Amino acid sequence: MVDVGRVTRTAYAEAFGAVTGRPLIKLPQLPGRAESEIFFDALALNAADLNADGEAERLLEPFSKALAAALAAHQDDLTRQGQLLPGAADAVEAVAKLEGTVATVLTGSSRPNAVLKLSSFGLENFVDFEIGGYGSEAYPKGTLLRVAKERASSKHGVSFGDDATVYIADSARDVDAARIGGARSLAVASGRATAAELRDAGADAVLPDLTDTAGLTALIVRLTAPSS
């Protein structure tokens, strides 16, 4: 929904340095990955000297707090240097207003960081963060999707089966997560993967971008219809 990669990279570098005392020279791939996964890869890539067993795991919580603080310090930069993907704002609002629908996020970010990023662009009122799935929980995304479904069921008192859940994805990895976690996958070729790659991955439906709001909501309705 939002592209804030430049600010996120800056925050990662600041948090990594604060926790390890070493500069972040090599940054792992960020999109689609959990913050914990990125941190452990960064330790390996930057040859951080961790002699004690369990030292990397012990540093994860301080790193998560430092990353949240760094992002908060750069909140104004999120909108100055970042951007909403084309059509994202209208799409999020339209999905939230679909009758019988609850909208949340499944993200590699921690909950505080996800809230910060979306609220910076005015999207916080269209997403129920309470039932989301977050990278700070260190689950694979497929498992994290099941956790989010359970949270939604507990809060709303209804079961969200595989055919009643749509994961709007933008990578082959996310399409796999939808299959594992129990959801229909509506993939958007927003840059991380081509439409052909998303179809080959097995996406239930593919859109070129988020600009066709009516088309997006129509696909969600079709994918969750009893006969689909």
Model-derived regions: residue spans:
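Active-site phosphate-binding/coordination module
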Residues: 46-48, 53-73
